[in-house]
Amino acid sequence: GGPKVQEFERECERYFGAKHAITVNSWTSGLIAAIGAIGVEPGDEIIVTPWTMCASATAILHWNAIPIFADIETETFCLDIASVEANITHKTKAIMSVDIFGHSSDMDSLMSLAKKHNLKVISDTAQAPGALYHEKYAGTLADIGGYSLNYHKHIHTGEGGILVTNDDDLANRMRLIR
């Protein structure tokens, strides 16, 4: 992107407290870039909730991976940790949390579970860009997080999305894919 896009990325890095902020033309493209960056291969599984926009699952299908649907908590509508754990198999590559209605997923439990099973976590925070989890912005505690900038979201640029990560390698891969 040009100088204004780069300026916007730097501002997002400062605001969200992330090492890298990477703009994309849509949040769907952001999810596709995030999934590609973690090295998903055909047949790999990514655990996600069906309680979200279809882009969360279709971005998984873009890489010929398989979305595995886990239940949600009734109070937050975010992933239920016990359901996520019950759905982990030898084919599971990642967990995609969906922060929704201003609620953050239980990131301590998700990251602990991911570490236990050597999985990556992608946080789809399109519906909760200002939500806090232990004084940190939702989306910044996962390996990769991101936000929709669509015209009907809290922060908008007309269209687009922004990925955040603190991992240099993942950031470079996402820049190549976008």
Name the predicted role of every residue range.
Residues 1-45, 59-63, 68-71, 136:
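Phosphate-binding glycine-rich loop
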Residues 2, 28, 50-51, 104, ...:
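Alpha-helix N-cap/helix-start capping motif
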